[in-house]
Amino acid sequence: MNPYLILLKPRVIWLLILASLAGYLYSARQPNIAQAFSLLLVAFLSTGGAAAFNHYWERDIDAAMRRTAKRPLPAGLVEPRNALAYSLVLSALGIALGFLLLGPLPGLFVFLGWFFYAVVYTVILKKRTWLNILGGGFAGNATFLGGYALGAGTVDLHAVLISFAIYLWIPSHIWALAYKYRDDYRRAGVPMLPTVVGEKAAVAIISLLNLASAAYIMTLYLAFGGGLLGGALVAAGVVATIATGAYALATKTDEAMWKMYKASSPVLTLFLLALIANA
């Protein structure tokens, strides 16, 4: 894969882009292709720009971790100054087009999504506290709310409650991954939940958070009267998450934690697809 494409973290940002599209299609009475395309373009540029900036800022961390040592910057495939310029150009384009093409309120959420990931999480919190992902997680809320604001022209409590399905899923997902690579994070000096609270406590917290996230997603879907097809999709992901989360909580083994991580990965995607299906 081209190193500049890798800098965009496509396996991460596609879910944020999907969240923005789901917010738009869920809220718009009469969605149109031009608006949807503009939203996708803006979401791609702003999230990709933030991801590329994260690569630039964390290049020393990436070099110290086995999991990330082959990324473009520590591997010498991209010069740091080029990565910085690339990230800033994409970010500026995404934010500017967010205001120009989508309007003031959606544009504000585009900016907030970028800010929470690139500045709050990456620059301010990542190396300082294990609570870093709780600050950065608001980027997930913002992407959904930006799409919702574009479709509805406003943001209401309904939208905020749905956006917190994303917020709850993010730390449970990231911490489960961090548990597997906890030695890497210790080596790099990055505080993450599994490296600061002890392994048994981390397993309990992550498992319970996964269970809470799955339960919240299912409750939201039922409370807002979702359809049968979408309900089947969401239920499949939720059941898998609850089953593996309960098993991880009971056994507290690395294998069980990894199974929970893999099982919980699709649940947010299924929820967002269900929102689109019910639009």
Swiss-Prot record:
Pathway connected to this protein: Porphyrin-containing compound metabolism; heme O biosynthesis; heme O from protoheme: step 1/1
The keyword Transmembrane helix is annotated on this UniProt entry: yes
GO cellular component, one term: plasma membrane
UniProt GO molecular function: protoheme IX farnesyltransferase activity
InterPro entries, sorted: Protohaem_IX_farnesylTrfase (IPR006369), UbiA_prenyltransferase (IPR000537), UbiA_prenylTrfase_CS (IPR030470), UbiA_sf (IPR044878)
Membrane topology, record value: Multi-pass membrane protein
Stretch forming the signal peptide: none
Localisation: Cell membrane
Spans through the membrane: 5-25, 33-53, 84-103, 108-125, 133-153, 159-179, 201-221, 222-242, 256-276
Note: Carbon 2 of the heme B porphyrin ring is defined according to the Fischer nomenclature.
Name of the protein: Protoheme IX farnesyltransferase
Native species: Pyrobaculum arsenaticum (strain DSM 13514 / JCM 11321 / PZ6)
